[in-house]
C-alpha cells in the first residue's frame, strides 16, 4: 500500500489551530503519513512544523491568483487536503478546483460580524462548508452551524493539544515575581486582543475587585487591534491590569496563577481552558459555545457580557481557598477524561483513510 500523502493548510494560524496542526503533523508522520504544512512563514517560525518531520511550504494568507496557484502546486499529488479554519478552507477550495482531491475542514472557531461584514462572513461560511467532503468541529454548536451552512458531512471531533510543559513550583515563583504578584492574587487571561474575547468586560470586572486588599493583579497575554483602547482604559481608570503581549512560556505563567479567566463571547475547546484545568488552576469562564461540555462541573461558568457576575465570582473564589482547591482537583479529573492526542490523530487518520480509499486508483491529479 502506498504512503498516504496529506497537506495541512493554515491561514493566520491562531494559537489553538497552529498547536493542533503541529500535534497532528507529528502524530501522522509517526504513523507513516507524508505530511506537508502550508502556512504563512511567520506561523512556521513560531511553531517549527519541520521539527515534526513534516515538509513546510510558505504560502501567504491571501486569495490572489499567485497565492492560490502556490497552494494548488503544493497540493499536487495529495491524497487528502486538510484546511484549518474558514479562510484556509475557502482558499484551498479555489486551489483544488477541477481536482478530485477530497477536502477536510476543521472549523476551529466561530466568528462574528455586523452589517455588510456579516453577509460576507455568511457567504464565506457557506462556501467553506459546502466545499469540504467532511467538516470536523470541536463543539456541538459548530457541528450544527456547519450543517446549517450546507455541509455534506459534519462531525464532532474534539481537538486535543499537547499538555504544556511545567517548570514546577520554582518556575511558578519566578513567574509571579516577574509579573509583580508575589504578595497579591494573580489572575491570568490569554487571547488575541479583539472584541469577541471579551476583555472589555474583564476590565469592567477589574473595577470591582480593585477594592480588595491586597488588590489582585490581572495579567492578559496576547496582542491585537484592541490593545491601545484597552491600555488607555487601564491607564485612565487606574485598573490593576497588565498587558504583557505575546509571550513564550504562557503555560508557566498560567500555572502560577490563582485563577484563570475566560470572558469570551464564544469558544470551542478553548486552549486556555484546557491548559488551566490540566494545570489545576481554577477557571472562571463564560458559558458559551463548547465551554460547558469541555469543562463540565470543573469550572465556574458565568453569562457572557455580565461583568458583575464575573467580578462577584472572582471575589468569592479569592476568599475561599477550599473551593479553589476543590476546583483545581476537579479540573485535573475532568482533563484526564478528555480525548488524548493519540485519540485525535487516530480519528483524523480514519477520516483520511475513509476519503482516500474510493480515490486510490484511477484518479487524475
Regions found by a protein language model. Name each.
Residues 15-26, 185, 189-208, 225-231, ...:
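A conserved mid-protein helix/loop that constitutes part of the nucleotide-sugar donor-binding site
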Residues 130-155:
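A short, active-site helix/loop in glycosyltransferases that binds the activated sugar's phosphate group
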Residues 246, 265:
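Aromatic "clamp/platform" in nucleotide-sugar-dependent glycosyltransferases that forms part
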Residues 282-285:
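Short hydrophobic beta-strand element within catalytic cores of glycosyltransferases
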Amino acid at each position: 500500500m502506498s504512503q498516504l500523502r496529506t497537506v495541512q493548510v493554515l491561514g493566520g494560524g491562531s494559537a489553538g489551530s497552529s498547536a493542533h496542526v503541529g500535534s497532528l503533523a507529528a502524530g501522522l508522520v509517526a504513523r507513516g503519513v507524508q505530511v506537508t504544512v502550508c502556512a504563512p512563514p511567520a506561523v512556521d517560525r513560531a511553531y517549527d512544523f519541520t521539527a515534526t518531520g513534516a515538509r513546510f511550504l510558505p504560502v501567504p494568507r491571501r486569495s490572489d491568483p499567485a497565492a492560490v496557484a502556490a497552494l494548488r502546486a503544493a497540493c499536487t499529488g495529495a491524497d487528502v487536503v486538510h484546511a484549518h479554519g474558514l479562510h484556509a478552507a475557502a482558499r484551498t477550495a479555489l486551489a483544488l478546483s477541477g481536482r478530485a482531491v477530497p477536502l477536510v475542514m476543521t472549523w476551529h472557531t466561530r466568528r462574528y460580524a455586523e452589517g455588510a461584514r456579516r453577509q460576507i462572513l455568511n457567504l464565506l461560511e457557506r462556501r467553506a462548508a459546502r466545499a469540504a467532503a467532511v467538516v470536523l468541529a470541536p463543539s456541538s454548536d459548530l457541528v450544527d452551524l456547519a450543517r446549517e451552512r450546507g455541509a455534506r458531512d459534519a462531525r464532532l471531533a474534539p481537538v486535543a493539544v499537547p499538555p504544556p510543559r511545567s517548570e514546577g513550583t520554582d518556575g511558578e515563583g519566578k513567574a509571579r515575581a516577574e509579573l509583580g504578584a508575589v504578595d497579591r492574587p494573580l489572575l491570568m487571561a490569554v487571547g488575541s486582543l479583539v472584541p469577541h474575547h471579551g476583555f472589555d468586560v474583564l476590565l469592567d470586572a477589574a473595577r470591582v475587585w480593585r477594592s480588595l486588599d491586597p488588590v489582585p493583579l490581572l495579567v492578559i497575554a496576547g496582542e491585537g487591534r484592541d490593545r491601545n483602547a484597552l491600555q488607555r482604559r487601564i491607564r485612565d481608570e487606574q485598573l490593576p491590569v497588565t498587558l504583557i503581549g505575546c509571550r513564550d512560556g504562557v503555560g508557566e505563567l498560567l500555572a502560577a496563577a490563582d485563577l484563570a479567566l475566560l470572558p469570551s463571547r464564544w469558544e470551542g475547546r478553548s486552549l486556555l481552558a484546557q491548559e488551566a484545568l490540566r494545570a489545576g488552576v481554577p477557571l472562571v469562564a463564560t458559558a458559551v459555545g463548547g465551554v460547558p461540555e469541555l469543562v463540565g462541573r470543573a469550572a465556574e461558568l458565568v453569562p457572557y457580557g455580565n461583568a458583575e457576575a464575573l467580578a462577584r465570582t472572582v471575589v468569592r473564589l479569592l476568599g475561599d481557598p477550599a473551593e479553589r482547591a476543590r476546583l483545581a482537583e476537579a479540573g485535573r479529573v475532568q482533563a484526564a477524561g478528555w480525548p488524548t492526542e493519540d485519540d485525535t490523530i487516530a480519528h483524523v487518520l480514519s477520516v483520511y483513510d475513509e476519503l482516500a480509499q474510493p480515490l486510490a486508483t484511477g484518479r487524475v491529479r
